[in-house]
Amino acid sequence: MNLLERIKKLPEDWKRIITVAKKPDKDTFSMYLKVTLIVMAFVGLLAYLIQLVLAFII
């Protein structure tokens, strides 16, 4: 399948994904949001600590 055929097929694939996908309920969305925020905070804290340590080493 060449690139042009793949590009022409994209809207059909997107439509299929939208019809199969379902909206999460409130509890599931809340859980995903909490997990995402906790992971973002952890990564931010880790990056800050690494930057802080490297600032004192260099």
UniProtKB/Swiss-Prot annotation:
UniProt topology in membrane: Single-pass membrane protein
Subunit structure comment from the entry: Component of the Sec protein translocase complex. Heterotrimer consisting of SecY (alpha), SecG (beta) and SecE (gamma) subunits. The heterotrimers can form oligomers, although 1 heterotrimer is thought to be able to translocate proteins. Interacts with the ribosome. May interact with SecDF, and other proteins may be involved.
Organism encoding this protein: Acidianus ambivalens (Desulfurolobus ambivalens)
Keywords from the UniProt entry: Cell membrane, Membrane, Protein transport, Translocation, Transmembrane, Transmembrane helix, Transport
Main localisation: membrane
Coiled coil: none
Matches recorded under InterPro entries: Prot_translocase_SecE_dom_sf, Translocase_Sec61-g, Translocase_SecE/Sec61-g
Gene3D superfamilies: Preprotein translocase SecE subunit
One GO cellular component term: plasma membrane
UniProt cross-references to HAMAP family, sorted A to Z: SecE (MF_00422)
Transmembrane segment boundaries: 38-58
Role description: Essential subunit of the Sec protein translocation channel SecYEG. Clamps together the 2 halves of SecY. May contact the channel plug during translocation.
Name of this protein: Protein translocase subunit SecE
GO BP term, pick one: protein secretion
Superkingdom to which the source organism belongs: Archaea
GO molecular function: protein transmembrane transporter activity
Location of the protein in the cell: Cell membrane
